[in-house]
Amino acid sequence: MKVRPSVKPICEKCKVIKRKGKVMIICENPKHKQRQG
């Protein structure tokens, strides 16, 4: 999980979702997981 000020989809499988008011990216590739901090 990467915590970044700006999250962007890295590949086509990356999905942007919102959980508890935080923007997150979920993907099949675990390296692509990101969350806005």
Curated annotation (Swiss-Prot):
GO molecular function: structural constituent of ribosome
InterPro entries according to UniProt: Ribosomal_bL36, Ribosomal_bL36_sp
A GO BP entry: translation
Domain of life according to the entry: Bacteria
Keywords assigned by UniProt, alphabetized: Ribonucleoprotein, Ribosomal protein
Signal peptide: none
NCBIfam families: rpmJ_bact
Protein name: Large ribosomal subunit protein bL36
